[in-house]
Amino acid sequence: MGKNFSRFAAVLLAVSMPAAAFAYTFDRDVPANIKTQMLDDLSFVGTIQGSQASSLHQQIFGQVDGATYNQFFSSRVMSVGMNGCGDGNAVACVIPMQDSSKIWLPQNYIKFSHPQIARLMVVFHESRHTEDANDNWPHANCPTPFLDKDGSDMKSVWTGASLAGEPACDETPFGSYGSSMIMLKNISKFCTNCSDKVKMDAGIYADDQFKRLISPDAIAQVQKDLYSGQ
């Protein structure tokens, strides 16, 4: 995520919904395989069924339910295009001064291979950045140094880039990092029709994104909501 887009860019997601049912469009420069992949990913998320939802998930999305996720995404994102996003470390971005309902994909989204649920994490992260009424949920700068529990530098799970000092953290569970990790953690815990692999991947990526929350209050809220008893 680039400093020039520190408020807006993200370095930081039964029966399938047919691709024609999606309301958003793809620019011509989006590679055909990436368009197909994203449509397949969003069709998959539309099939999810859950037994329950955590309190924070209910506040942000509602129930753990495919139709709920599709409505959340399609009510925010109208189009997808290609853009460098201002920084070689970016994975995707929204640029509100150009179009706050458009997700832009740089080469990092294409060239790195990650599980389907991780790709959904990225685009749902970006969908939160479309919310003009919430100032597009700007990120906070990560601490310097920014270390994990073992004392190693925190790095992007997607690109491996160092996060210290970068606008790649959040101080609220309701921003892009918090909302997407809450979504994935709920899928990991409560999805009733997901494979073990999907639930495992969702848990791994959710736990990684949880580390992007840097305020004690935000951390405490998510711990109480999703990690108590673990």
Pin down the residues of each PLM region.
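Bacterial N-terminal signal peptides that target proteins for export
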Residues: 1-9
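Bacterial N-terminal signal peptides
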Residues: 9-18
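Predominantly extracellular/secreted Zn2+-dependent metalloproteases
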Residues: 21-120, 130-230
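Substrate/cofactor-recognition hotspot
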Residues: 123
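Walker B catalytic acidic pair
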Residues: 126
